[in-house]
């Protein structure tokens, strides 16, 4: 989006990979709908989404990223406030003997995810999921069932932003200390919203379900 906004670059910058496509790529636009649940995937709505993401980037405290995209992060740094950058895998609490998730013990935790009911069922049998009990400690669990709008299913909302506002209202009904989020394109803006209301949020993305022992095809 930043490349589109800046316009056509010098050819050598594009060939070096210093800048991305400076036109609206139809494949990327369709992926936003089919993979991330954004709708409608037109220029007007996507531009609004991108501007919101740039504004919310300033609220990041810790940013996990794939090594393959770290080179391109310099483009976003002007919109950030010096967050700590870590490998994305560090968010997985089950890969270490001293998981970060141990701090959830005794807290009020709300999980925002399409698999809300399954996550509640899995948490009820958490003692069977991991040998290290600190991965999923004893806390007060609440869930908000995220809107699942992948593939163009609008779920009765007029657009993605309408669905986002509905989820913000649902979050406002919950009493919690920490919010764990995994819900496609909604995740990062919801995490920013949680911080704005004075609470803490961890935006996992798709990997959140693993924390509750729920596998998916991508991990087979």
Per-segment meaning from a language model:
Residues 1-135:
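Electropositive, gly/pro-rich neighborhoods at or near active sites that engage anionic ligands
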Residues 79-86, 142-166:
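Glycine-rich phosphate-binding "P-loop"
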Residues 1, 68-71, 114-118, 180-189, ...:
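Gly/Ser/Thr-rich loops at beta-strand to alpha-helix junctions
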Residues 135-143:
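Glycine-rich phosphate/diphosphate-binding loop of Rossmann-like nucleotide-binding domains
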Residues 37-41, 168-182:
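Extended, charge-rich low-complexity interaction segments
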Residues 186-198:
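Short Gly/Thr/Asp-enriched flexible loops that form oxyanion-binding sites at enzyme active sites
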Residues 142-154, 197-220:
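Short, flexible loop segments at boundaries between secondary-structure elements
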Residues 46-48, 161-175, 186:
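A short, acidic, amphipathic alpha-helical segment used as a generic capping/interface helix at domain edges
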